[in-house]
Amino acid sequence: DSALGNTASFGGSSVAENACYINGLEVTNTRQGLGCGEVPFEFYDQFQVKTGGYSAKFGRATGGTINTTTKSGTNEWEFAAVVQFQPDSLQEEGSISRGNNGAGQIFRDESLDSDSKTDVTFSAGGPLIEDTLFFYGLINPRDTESTYTWGGDEFSPNDQYRNESASGGDNLFWGGKLDWDINENHRLSYFAYSNRRDIERSVYEYDNGAVGDRIDGAILKRGGEAQSLSYTGVLTENLVVTA
């Protein structure tokens, strides 16, 4: 639904009635119920999309549920690096719309819109104690910048030019998972991540194609930290306990 942040509707309910889980921890947007906590794709191991008939632990949704697990360490050390670069110079120039059947002043100006992004991911996983204690970790430095004109709503002409940028330590994603196989029937797992982002917004005057003085600014805080501790125990052939 493009009107609600391009979030997905599935399972027969609205976009605000889905739920998202990572390693059993609910990471749905708690303020609005829209979307999930942002995590780099490289951090994931498996995905499940449930649209009905799921157990009580997924009962906080009337729509669908996205259930995911992250990668874990194994008995072999593995390392990886991924670099993604999206320069604004490769984007097509936006259009300009004018009032009075194209003969009037500028109503919408997308020619100044731009987006650039640099995304680097480093990960490592392996045994801290062979067959017993395993670690997997990932860090993701991110650098983004976007500019656009803005008019308040779809019926108002553009009267502002905005620049939004996010970089540095306040925009570093990190995540990790620690698994302790106490014995073949009992496992203790600790999982944590931070997807905090501080976006610096600067607002400038805009009038009929001309960008003026800076008139406002703000720091937009997004994301945060999450962590969980879970236990899985096989008590008998017919009884498994998770907590």
Specify the residue positions occupied by each region the protein language model found.
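Periplasmic N-terminal accessory/gating domains of Gram-negative outer-membrane beta-barrel systems
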Residues: 1-72, 103-109, 117-123
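Surface-exposed strand-loop-strand hairpins of Gram-negative outer-membrane beta-barrel proteins
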Residues: 89-116
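Transmembrane beta-barrel wall of Gram-negative outer-membrane proteins
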Residues: 111-199, 219-240
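Outer-membrane beta-barrel translocator domains and adjoining extracellular loop/strand segments
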Residues: 33, 91-98, 148-154, 195, ...
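Transmembrane beta-strands of outer-membrane beta-barrel proteins
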Residues: 48, 80-84, 138-140, 191-193, ...
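Extracytoplasmic loops and strand-loop junctions of Gram-negative outer membrane beta-barrel proteins
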Residues: 29-30, 49-50, 99-108, 156-162, ...
